[in-house]
């Protein structure tokens, strides 16, 4: 192939935009040292990537899966759900109820809006330094 265009590859990948994404991803792989599957013929990496797709030496589905995997930052792993155990003894139930009653009796200090404003007014602004 003398020149590879998008038209040569459109029958392999239906969407032109997806084709460009896949070819760009493959070109980045080649620049990072991946083995090429066609002869280079003094072509640049994007042209080599398009030639690989046109010659079907690479599967577009595999390239798409690899592109998706490379873009993911957080991969969700299906973990089995924890099995809930039911309490069968009444003494255990009473101890659980006692701890919940203790939590209800806890009190927190609340600040009124006036106290908050008074505290903000009392703050001292730090001196400006030339470190910025």
From Swiss-Prot:
Q: Any idea which UniProt keywords this protein has?
A: DNA-directed RNA polymerase, Nucleotidyltransferase, Transcription, Transferase
Against SUPFAM superfamilies, the record matches this protein to: RPB6/omega subunit-like
GO cellular component terms, semicolon-separated: DNA-directed RNA polymerase complex
Q: What is its EC number?
A: 2.7.7.6
Give GO BP annotations, semicolon-separated: DNA-templated transcription
Name the catalysed reactions: RNA(n) + a ribonucleoside 5'-triphosphate = RNA(n+1) + diphosphate
Among the Pfam families in the record, one is RNA_pol_Rpb6
Top-rank taxon, per record: Bacteria
Write out the GO MF terms.
Answer: DNA binding; DNA-directed RNA polymerase activity
Please report which protein family the annotation says this sequence is part of: Belongs to the RNA polymerase subunit omega family.
Q: Which HAMAP family match?
A: RNApol_bact_RpoZ (MF_00366)
Q: How does it assemble?
A: The RNAP catalytic core consists of 2 alpha, 1 beta, 1 beta' and 1 omega subunit. When a sigma factor is associated with the core the holoenzyme is formed, which can initiate transcription.
Task: Please give the function described in this protein's UniProt entry.
Answer: Promotes RNA polymerase assembly. Latches the N- and C-terminal regions of the beta' subunit thereby facilitating its interaction with the beta and alpha subunits.
The name of this protein is DNA-directed RNA polymerase subunit omega
Origin organism lineage? Bacteria, Pseudomonadati, Pseudomonadota, Alphaproteobacteria, Hyphomicrobiales
